Amino acid sequence: DKKYKEALFFGLQYYLKEYLTEPITREHAEEFFDYRRQILGHVPDDIRTKINSLVKLGYWPLRVKAVAEGTRVQNRNALMTVTNTRDGFYWCVGYVESLLLKVWNTTTVATYSNQLKRLFTAWCERTGGIPELIPFQVHDFGYRGCSSEETAALSGMSHLVNFLGTDTITAIKAARQYYNAEEPVGLSVPASEHSVMCSFGRHGEIAAFRNMLAKNPTGIVSIVSDTYNLWEILTTGVDQLREEILARNGKLVFRPDSGDPEEILCGDPKAPVGSPERLGVFEILAAKFGTETTRTGHRLLNPKIGVIYGDAMYYERIERILAKMDAMGLCSSNLV
């Protein structure tokens, strides 16, 4: 379409290795005959002859040609072709069609993920950001949204073509098994969830923060910050935690997780003047912890803190947020 003029091809090797490399046996043939009888009522002699000849051969006589996985290809070009390699086995091509066409899913996810990478790369350049952070600026929390373990592995692996950040363990396993991927395949950080924060009680949220910081004294740690009241945490809560955050050898990443992401992060113009809601997360944290100035004159938050937003995100919304950040004089590297 007008927006996606090319596709990033990915996923073929998984289907070839998982489904088409196993030797074809008599057991496979009998299973096929059984399903044929169930669905169509009988197995014609010509079908039985074809399948028996395939069992005798023992493998799929097919040649699959494809562009290199990970390649971006202009739309309306062939991504792969399948032909038979032995006379009389022309019909095998049609038998694997449905299986191999499932690369539409992995290719679609890889393409979408690549568009996000290109978006963050462009805004990083425009705002003087940190290129080394880009592989972590789009993080895969999609495991729970997938319909199966296989879907999670394949979709998550497609994301890893472009980024390193993931919480989808099956994707890391699949990348190693089917693509011989070398470390680092996918990375993440210690992070809290709402149940953890609730376990300290309504008035124990600061204690929950301190507990997370104590258990993770170094490196990056992400803490969900809207369990009760995001704005309380970012104002009075941060005042209580400020010295501990600054003294820590690492970065505390605040995670808002509800509301309109654009307004939460960049400020709600409808909120009362001077209110935390009007300022938004970035401006509050900039005032509390200070900023550095990038080569383009944009503001980059103190390296001791960061912001991640993982709810209700999609390309157009992310694009709007990055544009608003630019208009506010904020560097794109402030956001994961």
Residue locations for each model-derived region?
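Catalytic cores of alpha/beta
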Residues: 313-327
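Active-site-proximal binding-pocket segments
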Residues: 303, 309-311, 332
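Buried, small/hydrophobic-residue-enriched core segments of structured protein domains
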Residues: 52-61, 70-74, 79-295, 314-317
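A structural micro-motif recognizing beta-strand termini
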Residues: 1, 67-69
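Glycine-rich beta-to-alpha transition loops that act as phosphate-gripper elements at the mouths
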Residues: 67, 307-315
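Glycine-rich phosphate-binding active-site loops on the catalytic face of alpha/beta enzymes
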Residues: 328-336
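N-terminal active-site wall of soluble small-molecule enzyme domains
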Residues: 43-49
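Low-complexity, highly charged intrinsically disordered N-terminal segments
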Residues: 1-43
